[in-house]
Swiss-Prot record:
InterPro entries: Met_Sox_Rdtase_MsrB, Met_Sox_Rdtase_MsrB_dom, Mss4-like_sf. The active site is at C126. PANTHER family: METHIONINE SULFOXIDE REDUCTASE, PEPTIDE METHIONINE SULFOXIDE REDUCTASE MSRA_MSRB. One of its GO terms (molecular function) is peptide-methionine (R)-S-oxide reductase activity. Signal peptide: none annotated. It catalyses: L-methionyl-[protein] + [thioredoxin]-disulfide + H2O = L-methionyl-(R)-S-oxide-[protein] + [thioredoxin]-dithiol. This is Peptide methionine sulfoxide reductase MsrB.
Amino acid sequence: MNHKKEKEYKKLDTEKLKENLTELQYNVTQRNATEKPFLNKYDKHFEDGIYVDIVSGEPLFLSIDKFNSGCGWPAFSKPISRKYIKERADFSHGMSRIEVRSKNADSHLGHVFNDGPIENGGMRYCINSASLKFIAKDKLKEEGYEEFLPLFEKDKQEL
């Protein structure tokens, strides 16, 4: 019998996080900070690949679901799979929003809004670049994410 073992994604302890992350990455993922709009790594980045949690490596978003929303942060129409994210109400700063976090590492990623392209489901996942690591499509196998290669096919399906 061939049982494929589910990959485990874990959060490092605080000391290791501070060693491995930049100050901005730490503040965004661990302290719910927001990076500056338009002055971040992935806002205008459209290479084929996946975006994973900078803390745990959890696969979060596909480049083919990324779009230019004009908001200044990377925007996606949907996550790779809902099993890798969690959403919760966020009433901070006098606003009512839905926060998006990674499921296992509990990293703050950004927020989701219902003003995305209608033809792609109407959602806009507005995500901080500092919470992400990009893995190019041609590096997915090498980095241990080969299971996501079929999602780049024309008739892709959500996991």
